């Protein structure tokens, strides 16, 4: 093999290390610099290069050269073992409060009460799909967790979903790995983004999704539960943890997401999913990540 070096920032170094390990290069060489986030810079011009980029990169050029020229050690040359598609099962017995405390301590929720994912509850959730429980829907970045149907169902139970919501969650997980989404960028950014899930087609009415007034407010069970389930999936399968992968400076009040349906029946436009070649009778999930907010006052 040939030496490779990743240039990273000190405040996201741990995230970079964990990401490299997840991609089977645990001994990747790193060089830390002080370059700040340039996501919102309008253009890469001479002033930016001279005033911001050069002062951060020039001091570490020698380290970069050394990392690229220094021969690999035997440890770095070794091929890492790739774990099989298995995950440890854990059984915990206790009161509802004890279960919630245990899950919170393990980092499996954000502290709000969950529905315990008992074997019976997960089996009931799996009745919402024809997929086998061990079917891998996707490998979710940043940590490339294998999102099996069973794992998705576990998080759906925890979030308070009904089995009829499971097809929406499976479709959303498939969408998460679309290159257009660039999930790593949104989940691991230093900026705060909010996941947005919009649903089209007959399934909106089948599951009772709110598509009208207060559709963003989370009063309605399907809207709130689906958004929370996807947030838990991002934590527990994607492996996105605060300060480890999610490096947002201030975060976002809607970080755990919003879910709503398009009000197709009262909209002056054709349903959004038809713009992508789908039929109006098809059900579809659209994913996006929002940073800015808009205020709508009066009227519809």
Across the structure, where does each feature detected by a protein language model lie?
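Conserved beta-strand edge residues that scaffold enzyme active sites
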Residues: 11-12, 34, 170
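Long, charge-dense
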Residues: 29-42
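A charged, well-structured terminal subsegment
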Residues: 39-75
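Short, surface-exposed basic-aromatic patches at helix termini and helix-loop junctions that form
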Residues: 1-2, 21-25, 278
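Short hydrophobic alpha-helical runs that function as membrane-insertion/retention elements
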Residues: 3-8
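Active-site-proximal loop->helix
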Residues: 11-26
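Non-transmembrane, aqueous-exposed alpha-helical and coiled segments at domain scale
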Residues: 82-300
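N-terminal accessory regions of nucleic-acid-interacting proteins
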Residues: 73-76, 84-86
